[in-house]
A protein has these predicted regions:
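SAM-dependent methyltransferase
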Residues: 3, 7-74
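C-terminal lobe and adjacent flexible extensions of AdoMet/dcAdoMet transferase-like proteins
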Residues: 66-111
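A contiguous, well-structured "functional interface" segment within a domain
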Residues: 1-4, 87
Length: 111
């Protein structure tokens, strides 16, 4: 059994582009902005963290995360090429089938 999860194409194409989340606390701040990337179903997350140090100053930490997902058919083909005979597909952290607006897909593949 091989179990994995990925963002859905709805998540990368409709939800993430333009997504912005900012959090500000006394000892910590985070900026998270997401942009559409060039490849189909791909996005770039730009994250900036400000962490308060013991001396009261703040240090800055930047991260860039690039993510891409594919259509379910592509995962089906790749799983078959890897020797898997079948898979079940679930969505959004629940025991349910995906819908058009599901944001996360969970694959349970069998050899």
């Amino acid at each position: 059994v091989f179990i994995f999860d990925v963002h859905s194409t709805y998540q990368t194409d409709e939800v993430f582009p333009g997504y912005s989340y900012h959090e500000n606390a006394e000892d910590f701040a985070m900026l998270w902005d997401t942009y559409e990337d060039v490849a189909p179903h791909s996005i770039v997350h730009e994250l900036t963290f400000f962490v308060k140090e013991e001396d009261g100053s703040f240090s800055r930490h930047d991260e860039v995360h690039e993510e891409r997902t594919y259509e379910v058919l592509t995962y089906d083909i790749l799983l078959e090429q890897a020797g898997f005979k079948s898979f079940k597909l679930y969505a959004d952290f629940e025991d349910k089938e995906p819908t058009e607006t599901s944001t996360r897909w969970f694959f349970v593949a069998q050899k």
